[in-house]
């Protein structure tokens, strides 16, 4: 009964956040989150989950070119995870982001006071990002990859790869954490 009530309240809370987030379907919000949307757009797919303390920022300095933060279907944003977007952050379907993760596609300031440089981040489908990982600007994380806890990702990660460390290094090829399918097994065998 208690679990059912928790899910109902999460869906109702998700409906309340529709004024700041465009949602393709029902999104569960399991507690208070921080959404800042200035000259930008935040899009969520169907059946996503957002956990307490998450911070979603889509903040463009230019009204003509708005920032776009997109999260695909069935993805999960963990407790206290922060996603900062000045240009474009794209998160695919079935992505699991653990708690305290930072996804930062820009430096918060630039040396000498010039314009802040932002570079898009792409996190492809079926990626699992471990606790307290940091994903920095200009990175693409390939389909089915796993990012280890505490990793600092500064370079692209190929599909079906485990990456960890500071800075993150590609450690080994992996099978998809989502389960097995013909495509996943063929990819992992390469």
Q: Where in this protein do the model-derived segments appear?
A:
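Short glycine-centered segments of the SAM/dcSAM-binding site in methyltransferase folds
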Residues: 162
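Beta-rich strand-turn-strand
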Residues: 84-85, 132-146, 151-155
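Flexible glycine-rich beta->alpha loop in the catalytic core of nucleotide-sugar glycosyltransferases
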Residues: 101, 108-109, 151-152, 158
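Domain-scale signature associated with acetyltransferase and cell-envelope carbohydrate enzymes
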Residues: 1-104, 124-126, 143, 159, ...
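Glycine/small-residue-rich pyrophosphate-binding loop that anchors the diphosphate of NDP-sugar donors
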Residues: 67, 87, 119-120, 131, ...
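Conserved catalytic-core motifs of eukaryotic protein kinase domains, centered on the activation segment
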Residues: 107-108, 113-115, 139, 173-174
């Amino acid at each position: 009964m208690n679990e059912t009530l928790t899910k109902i309240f999460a869906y109702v809370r998700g409906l309340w956040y529709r004024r700041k987030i465009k949602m393709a379907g029902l999104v569960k919000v399991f507690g208070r989150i921080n959404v800042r949307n200035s000259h930008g757009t935040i899009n969520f797919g169907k059946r996503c989950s957002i956990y307490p303390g998450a911070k979603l920022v889509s903040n463009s300095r230019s009204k003509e070119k708005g920032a776009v933060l997109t999260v695909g279907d069935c993805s999960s944003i963990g407790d206290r995870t922060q996603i900062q977007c000045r240009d474009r952050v794209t998160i695919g379907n079935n992505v699991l982001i653990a708690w305290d993760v930072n996804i930062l596609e820009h430096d918060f300031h630039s040396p000498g006071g010039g314009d802040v440089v932002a570079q898009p981040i792409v996190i492809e489908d079926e990626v699992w990002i471990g606790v307290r990982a940091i994903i920095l600007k200009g990175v693409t994380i390939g389909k089915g990859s796993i990012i280890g806890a505490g990793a600092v990702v500064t370079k692209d990660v190929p599909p079906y790869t485990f990456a960890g460390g500071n800075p993150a290094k590609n450690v080994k090829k992996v099978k998809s954490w989502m389960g097995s399918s013909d495509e996943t097994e063929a990819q992992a065998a390469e």
